[in-house]
Regions:
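Membrane-interfacial entry segments at the cytosolic side of transmembrane helices
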Residues: 22-25, 209-218, 283-297
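Membrane-interface micro-motifs in multi-pass membrane enzymes
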Residues: 51-54, 69-73, 117-172, 187-194, ...
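Transmembrane alpha-helices of multi-pass, membrane-embedded glycan-processing enzymes
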Residues: 93-107, 154-158
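Soluble catalytic regions of membrane-associated enzymes that act on cell-envelope
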Residues: 308-518, 543-564
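Start-transfer (signal-anchor) and selected internal transmembrane alpha helices
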Residues: 1-37, 289-296
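Internal/C-terminal transmembrane anchor helices
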Residues: 287-313, 343, 347
Length: 660
């Protein structure tokens, strides 16, 4: 009796849950989606949203409106750019994006008469949109479509609204002109989404109970304009590179090198989802417990697919966060991001080394050991070259590069991109500008604008470059654009004060710090898009005749990175001539003591090294004699644990770095 009651109790709970999901499923799924989106964008990827906004531009004037809207799918681009500007505030941007996702699910449910019982199906477009945006990754820096972040959600949602609206027309006499007008004008405004919506409208109209002649007429006119409209656009405009791309207008345009299977598949499926629901029929009734399992399984598939298809890379997130901090000139935050990651992965690095050590000890041959080491290399945290150079720049601005340059992990982890994006496209404007090369910064602003269009980011750095080189006329033109934005007009007003009153530049610590490095002939040369190599040569190859103390300080940092003894001593001799040497920075002492012992060309016996420097060097040598180094990668971790914050470790273990 008790067992029977227990089973009845369990069944009643399942029935109650199923009933609640059937009646309130749409709102339950909406709540889950809201939580997921706000956590993802508001917490984990807020810096990513800010960077997306900086790579776009929305101006409040009629010329900008005309330029954008008159292009095919221009209305979609314009509305997308309008919403993209709000990503500058991640909270506002996330709220808008979430509301649009929820509305897309609602309009899908209403348009295609999806029952409350099957409402989980209505959220599939929202999930695909999350996957499309989340799979962009490093293509953020090369994507040529303005407002790409909001284009899928707006294209799908607004086109589905059109399906709902035209489907309300009962008379075939009125629906045929409506389909024709929508197909033509909708395509010009929304591109491929309008074509897909036209197919959906045609299917829904064809399924109605009406005379056969009306059905045939609807079908013929719809097919005619589905083909005719893109062909006319292709022949009358120059916006499309090929006939195929004419049919795909409205889909964010990734370069061939950066396109990926996830992005392409999700985009294609999103377009198809405007057509497939038109064929929707309610799912057959099933038992309550089976229904609950089905809904839970679909929800789990949604969440798992979104997670697996999302581009997740620790270094990518850190690069963007550090880049945003540099834009704000928050140098401490740049260093803190790098330091926090070093500390965060210290425990996992230790576990990875223990695992590596046990596997290597169990290996029988050297080749087997090398294979194990190579396979497990990615188990250890290693910063990218951009992260390292951002951190070094921040230390220069804080004046602590000589004591802290090697206190955080160094390295050169490769990008998780289909094709490597050159560093100069990601950080060229920032590094060149703040290292006193505004002409190069300006050049890369123009290069980016020509290839990918003007955006907030390159407009700002072009403005700063022009102010530093007294090109106030060009700076005024760039500021004229920024003054017509919503979030950047305040910054533009501040910069305009320097144009109107050039004497204020001398009072700006930020500008003066850059100008102190501008002690060279202002001529452009070919950097071959290798920014690290160029900066090393710029600061260490030939010293300018009017070099400043600050120039010699920065030259020392780059000299240490060369790991070249002759380059170090040459820059060191310049440094001691122009800077206070009463308290020699720690890393300079470490390098001098190490190089002096490796090569006897320079007598270091009279140099006043700190006792801690000589003691750490002796300790490093003793540790080296006790721990045989078979390969650098295999022995890195134990040496890093003891000496990771010294130049000795950097010199011996940070090798074979590839710049890009």
């Amino acid at each position: 009796m008790a067992l029977t009651d227990s089973k009845k109790g369990k069944n009643s709970i399942v029935d109650l849950l199923s009933l609640n999901i059937e009646n309130y499923g749409f709102w339950i799924y909406s709540l889950i989606l809201t939580i997921v989106v706000f956590y993802t964008f508001g917490v984990e990827y807020s810096d990513w949203l800010i960077r997306i906004e900086s790579k776009s531009l929305f101006l409040y004037n009629h010329l900008f409106f005309q330029d954008v809207v008159l292009a095919p799918a221009g209305l979609l681009s314009y509305i997308s750019l309008f919403f993209t500007q709000f990503l500058h505030s991640p909270l506002i941007g996330t709220t808008i994006f979430t509301l649009l996702l929820l509305f897309s699910a609602y309009i899908t449910k209403v348009t295609y008469n999806i029952s409350d019982r099957d409402s989980v199906i209505a959220f599939l477009p929202a999930i695909l949109i999350l996957i499309i945006n989340g799979s962009i990754g490093y293509a953020l820096y090369t994507i040529k479509t303005a407002g790409f972040f909001f284009m899928p959600i707006l294209g799908y949602t607004l086109s589905t609204v059109a399906v709902w609206s035209i489907n309300k027309i009962k008379s075939p006499v009125l629906s045929i002109p409506a389909i024709i007008i929508w197909c033509f004008l909708g395509y010009l405004g929304f591109g491929v989404y309008a074509l897909a919506a036209t197919v959906a409208i045609t299917i829904l109209q064809y399924k109605r109970e009406c005379i056969t002649v009306a059905k045939i007429a609807i079908l013929v006119f719809a097919l005619l304009f589905l083909v005719f409209t893109p062909l006319v656009t292709y022949n009358l405009t120059t916006s499309a590179n090929s006939l195929l791309s004419t049919f795909l207008l409205g889909i964010p345009n990734l370069t061939e090198e950066q396109n990926n299977a996830i992005f392409s598949s999700a985009s294609a499926l999103l377009i198809a989802l405007q057509i497939i629901p038109a064929l929707y029929k309610p799912l057959p009734l099933i038992k309550a417990q089976h229904y609950l399992i089905f809904q839970s399984a679909v929800l789990a598939v949604y969440l798992l697919t979104s997670y697996l298809c999302w581009f997740r890379d620790t270094n990518f997130k850190a690069e963007i966060a550090m880049s945003n901090a540099i834009d704000r000139e928050d140098w401490k935050e740049v260093c803190n991001i790098h330091k926090a990651l070093t500390e965060k992965y210290s425990a996992s690095d230790k576990k990875a080394y223990n695992k590596l050590h046990s596997k290597v000890n169990a290996a029988n041959t050297s080749s087997e050991m090398d294979l194990i080491v190579e396979k497990m290399r990615n188990d250890f945290f290693e910063p990218s070259r951009i992260m390292v150079q951002y951190k070094n720049l921040a230390l220069v601005k804080l004046g602590t590069e000589g004591n802290q340059a090697f206190t955080c992990k160094d390295g050169g982890r490769e990008q998780k991109a289909q094709q490597t994006i050159p560093m100069v496209l990601q950080c060229g404007k920032q590094l060149y500008l703040y290292y006193g090369l505004p002409y190069f910064a300006y050049r890369w602003c123009i290069e980016e604008a020509v290839e990918y269009g003007w955006n907030v980011d390159n407009l700002k750095y072009a403005t700063l470059s022009c102010i530093l080189t007294d090109n106030f006329e060009m700076a005024d033109k760039f500021l004229h654009r920024l003054e017509k934005t919503l979030y950047h007009r305040k910054w533009a007003k501040q910069m305009r004060s320097y144009i109107d009153n050039p004497e204020q530049i001398a009072q700006s610590t930020s500008f003066q710090a850059i100008k102190s490095l501008m002690c060279y002939n202002n001529t452009l040369s070919n950097d071959q898009a290798l920014i690290e190599t160029y900066l090393i040569n710029h600061f260490t190859a030939k010293r300018p005749e009017n070099a400043t103390p600050q120039f010699d300080k920065v030259a020392m940092l780059w000299a240490l990175q060369t790991q070249d003894i002759g380059t170090f001593w040459r820059c060191f001799s310049h440094y001691v001539q122009t800077n206070d040497t009463q308290k020699m920075p720690r890393h300079y002492q470490e390098a001098a003591y190490l190089y002096g012992n490796l090569e006897k060309n320079v007598n270091i016996s009279n140099m006043p090294f700190d006792k801690t420097i000589t003691a750490s060097y002796d300790s490093f040598n003793r540790f080296s004699s006790q721990h045989r180094v078979r390969t650098i990668e295999e022995s890195k971790y134990p040496f890093y644990e003891r000496f990771g914050e010294t130049f000795y470790y950097y010199y011996y273990f940070i090798r074979n770095l590839n710049t890009y």
